[in-house]
């Protein structure tokens, strides 16, 4: 029996569902995003291996080029303020808020040279995506084993100074779409103090106007990005971590609410919180 009529009918039915159902459109776009991530990761891995032969932070420029094309597929626009503040000569720790699977597009849109990320170890085993992250120099941390995670962070602190690396970290530790920032974990701040390098906060506006898992919304939209002034850590010690976390949290939260046009009294979290290093 010829399968093509059935396949054609199934495709037409899927297209009809996408047109008529907001939920179907949402899952279709998320599914396409996953397919893009897998296929582009495979293609980028080949390019990285041919160009640089293995794992190196220099592969990040190739990865960034591939990922920046995603915004055209989804009709997303980025309005960036203060990007030149990321163009520092020396090493630094970059921190930003973490909202959804779309954060990767925002990160790659403004990724500075010689910048690596920290990610949970489970992502290393996600096929082509894990491979391209490894080739790009991403540092994987096993968050279930605190001692191992702290050891990796300590090694990274020495390496970032030695090799002049910028390290991008999401201090909330997990994706969050509640209309506010979650309390920050301390790991990024211990790292900056250990290496005596500045912290550069980056804030992305809320995605809720065009992407919302709960309401199955996924349309085109504009993302505002604001790079804040660097926060120095020269002379600070571990005893100053809590104050440093609070300083960064307060400035990032105020900026997030402002560029997202969310009144502070309507935000989900009223008081900043600090979580243990992880």
Swiss-Prot record:
One of its GO terms (cellular component) is endoplasmic reticulum membrane. SUPFAM superfamilies: Glycerol-3-phosphate (1)-acyltransferase. GO terms for molecular function: 1-acylglycerol-3-phosphate O-acyltransferase activity. Pathway: Phospholipid metabolism; CDP-diacylglycerol biosynthesis; CDP-diacylglycerol from sn-glycerol 3-phosphate: step 2/3. Keywords: Acyltransferase, Endoplasmic reticulum, Lipid biosynthesis, Lipid metabolism, Membrane, Phospholipid biosynthesis, Phospholipid metabolism, Signal, Transferase, Transmembrane, Transmembrane helix. Induction: Down-regulated in the heart by clofibrate, a PPAR-alpha agonist. A motif (HXXXXD motif) lies at residues 98-103. Expressed at high levels in the liver, at intermediate levels in the kidney, gut, heart and skeletal muscles. Undetectable in brain and spleen. Residues 51-121 are cytoplasmic. GO terms for biological process: CDP-diacylglycerol biosynthetic process; epidermis development; phosphatidic acid biosynthetic process; phospholipid biosynthetic process; positive regulation of cytokine production; response to xenobiotic stimulus; triglyceride biosynthetic process. It catalyses: a 1-acyl-sn-glycero-3-phosphate + an acyl-CoA = a 1,2-diacyl-sn-glycero-3-phosphate + CoA; 1-(9Z-octadecenoyl)-sn-glycero-3-phosphate + (9Z)-octadecenoyl-CoA = 1,2-di-(9Z-octadecenoyl)-sn-glycero-3-phosphate + CoA; 1-(9Z-octadecenoyl)-sn-glycero-3-phosphate + hexadecanoyl-CoA = 1-(9Z)-octadecenoyl-2-hexadecanoyl-sn-glycero-3-phosphate + CoA; heptadecanoyl-CoA + 1-(9Z-octadecenoyl)-sn-glycero-3-phosphate = 1-(9Z)-octadecenoyl-2-heptadecanoyl-sn-glycero-3-phosphate + CoA. It is found in: Endoplasmic reticulum membrane. The HXXXXD motif is essential for acyltransferase activity and may constitute the binding site for the phosphate moiety of the glycerol-3-phosphate. Converts 1-acyl-sn-glycerol-3-phosphate (lysophosphatidic acid or LPA) into 1,2-diacyl-sn-glycerol-3-phosphate (phosphatidic acid or PA) by incorporating an acyl moiety at the sn-2 position of the glycerol backbone. This is 1-acyl-sn-glycerol-3-phosphate acyltransferase beta. It comes from Mus musculus. The gene is Agpat2.
